[in-house]
Amino acid sequence: MRVIPDIEYGEAGGQRLLLDACLPPSRKSSTSNAPDPAPRASIIMIHGGSWTRGDKADPEYRDVCTWLAKAGYPTFNVDYRMDPAFIFPAALEDVKSAVTWLRQPEQLGRFNLDPARIAALGGSAGGNLASLLGTTGSGPVTEGTRVSAVVDLSGPADLTGADAKPGFIPVQLAFLGCASEVDCPAARAASPIFAVSADDPPFFIANSTNELIPIEQSRRFADALRAAGVPTTFVSVTGGLHSVAMLGPSLRARILDFYASTVGVNSASPAPGAG
């Protein structure tokens, strides 16, 4: 497994947009006469930090990136523009740009990727953005901004303030560029729960029972997806752990099983649940 840091995937607002590529071990030696391996399923990974801080290289997110790579999935851990300098929809535009960048023929060949099998994973604010990829992605699955599966860990699904904890409302308003919840049209646009449709990809949603994001909000999101006919797994994690901190062995195994059933297991990858 190797990590290639700081690959530029675009530019916006005068800022270079960078990602780290966590790549599985090579399956073909330079002296091998074996045929090239089949194009692989991959994962776009989005860090958290209340949309205002955090980095792809933070240890807890680098750990998840390398875990997924060791499980056989090329994983692309993205940075994106954050508030207060950039408000919604800048961050969503950036992660969508990362998806379209990954589908460029140059990148598909460079990393040996299947354009129809790009999944997403995000934690906290990154879970919100990953879910928005799932509910607002557009175009053909081989060319546009759609993803084929979403893992959402403690992602805010409803930014209208309906059931947010009081201390988190100012965080949401800063991301949205609003002074109050009363007049904030961006709140619905940034809420994946209001963008659910029958053609959304399968979702895996996990939330702790007593954490920053109310579990009722995540459950409402899961219910909305199911009502639309979207295959959805909802996991309630006992305790107060938030986002990627929830990722113990059992939850990691379930996530790999989810990816195996949606985007598939790459050849020569560990069996589902490994890692």
Regions inferred by a protein language model and the residue ranges of each:
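Alpha/beta-hydrolase superfamily serine-hydrolase fold, recognizing
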Residues: 1-275
